[in-house]
Amino acid sequence: FAGKPGAGKTTLAKILVKNIDCDYLYINATDERSIDVMRDKVGAFAASGTFKPLKIVILDEATHILQASQVILLNMMETYSLTTRFILTGNYPERLIDPLRSRCQEFDLSPPSKKVVAQHISTILDKEDIEYEIPDLVTIVNKFYPDFRKIINNCQKYTVDGALVLGEL
């Protein structure tokens, strides 16, 4: 999954694995991107047995994986293709080596319009019984769009005693 920060790439990957009968391994490739991680963690997981029909490896922020590690990952994808699927997320898919990228189905998570985001945030605030003024909601959406995560976090940050209070945003 490709897209800007806060687009929902990681959330979508986690939703997928939770709704499939599978074992899965999650790795944040920003922190764990070395050859050793690919060989020891990913390789060991892919090679291990399972009672489930499928195994999935989520490599979050895969565009941070070192180039040499990408080659190892490519080999694992080919070796374990019958039992293991790989979900790669990242902001910059062009950083992946071409042979790896060509083996992936790319989904670009483009942000919805500001209007759709504002409507969704309004629904969340209503369900959480948080009072708000439309101009305040519009201010938050305009300031942090298209980063949905930042919009939600700032709504939480500026909620005091059940009301969205911006003050000096």
Where are these regions (language model features)?
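Active-site-proximal segments of catalytic enzyme domains
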Residues: 159
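A Lys-centered signature of the CheY-like receiver
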Residues: 110
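Short, conserved phosphate/pyrophosphate- and ester-handling motifs at nucleotide-, phospho-/glycolipid
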Residues: 147
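P-loop/Walker A NTP-binding region and its immediately flanking N-terminal helices
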Residues: 1-107, 115-122, 126, 134-142, ...
